[in-house]
Amino acid sequence: VSDPAQIEGMLNNLVYNLFARSGQDDGRATGAKEIGNLIVFDHPESVDEIVKSPALFRKNFSLISALGFSRFNTNDEEWATRRAITQDRYLAAAKPPHGQSVSDIFSGDLADCETSLAGIHQALFTGAMTIFYQAFGLVAEARPTAVLFDRVRETLRRLQYYSWVTPTNAERDSAIQDARAVIADFGSQLMADPRAAAEMDRFSERAAGIDGFSPIEEFVMNLFAGVETTVTTVQWVIDRLGANQQVQERIYSEIADGKAQTPFTDCFINETMRYFPPIPFLTREVSTDAVLDGTSLRAGQLIMLSVVGVHQHPEFWENPRTFNASRKEFINNSFDRRAFIPFLTGPRMCGGARLGRLEVEQAVRAVVRQFAFTRADDVIRFDYALALRPASGMSVQMSRR
C-alpha cells in the first residue's frame, strides 16, 4: 500500500498548485488553464456556467465512490431522490429559532474541552456532530463516532489519491476493502440504536426506486460533508485570528456587545472562506462534446473547477491574494455572487448551506468568547483530504479569557 506521507504530499501539492496559479491576471477574459493533462476552469463566469449545467457537466468522483453513493456523487433523478431524503431535515435545523440551541451546544463543548488546539478541534467536532445527529432526531456517541470519522477521512484520502494516481490491483483492492469495512462498522453502530435504525428505514422508504440503495452510505457521506466543512472553516478562523491580534480584539468586542448584527465578524468569516475554501476544487465529467470559452471538450473528459481560482480571480476581487479582514467587497456587500462559492452554487449546491453557515457563525462566536489566540509565525500550511484544513502542528497558542 502506498506510503501515507506520499499520498498526503501529492494531494497537498495539487492544492498548492491551484493556489500558485490563482489571483494573477494572465490577460485572458475567461478560458481554461491546465494542470498536467487536466483542463482547469477558474473564471467565475465559466465555473458558474458549468455548475448550472448539471446535465452537460456531471459529477464523477471516480474511486471515491467506493465508500458509497449519496446525493454528493450521483446525478439526474437519482440525485433528486437522494436530495429529498435529507433536505427537509437540513432546512428545519437551520431555522433562526435554532440559533440559540446551536450556540449552546458549541459553548458547552468548548467550556469543557482541554485548552489546546486538539481540545478545541475535538469540541468543535463533537458540537457539529451533535447538531447533525439532532437534525435527524438522533443522539451521537461522540467517541466511537470520532474514531469512525477519522477512518472515513483517511479512507477518502487514499481513494482520492488513487483517482489521480493509478493504483496497483493490490492497492485498489485494499482501499476498497477498507472503505467497505468502515461503512459496515458505521452501520453496526447506527443499527444498534433503535432510533437510528428507524431513521435508516425512513431513508430506504424514500429511496425505494433506487436499486441497491444503502441508507448507511447516504448518512455517512452526509455526516462527513456536513461536519468536516464546518469544523475546518472554524479551524481556519482560529488560525487567522492568531495572526491578526487587533482584528481578534475587534471581533471579541463586537461579539461581547451581544448585538444581533456583527458585520465585522461576518466579514471576517467570509474572508476566511474566500481565502481557504472548504472544498478547494471539484471535478466534472463532460457528457457530450462541447465548447466552453473557446476550449473544445470531448464526451467523457474530466475537467477541474478551481474554487481557489474563483475566489482569487483578479477581475472580481481587489488584491485577491491578500487576506483582508476588512475586505470592502464583503463590508459593502458588493461582491459578485459568482465569485464567492464556499457552498458552491447552482442546482447542485450544498443542501446544508444554511445550517453550515449557522453552525460556523455560532461556533466562531463561542470560540472567541472563551479563547484568545496568538501565532509565533504566519506560515500557512494545510492538510487536504476532500476538505482543506490547517495542518496539524500549526504554531497557534491559546489561552482562556
Across the structure, where does each feature detected by a protein language model lie?
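Cytochrome P450 heme-thiolate "Cys pocket" and heme-binding signature region
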Residues: 81, 86, 329-365, 379-387
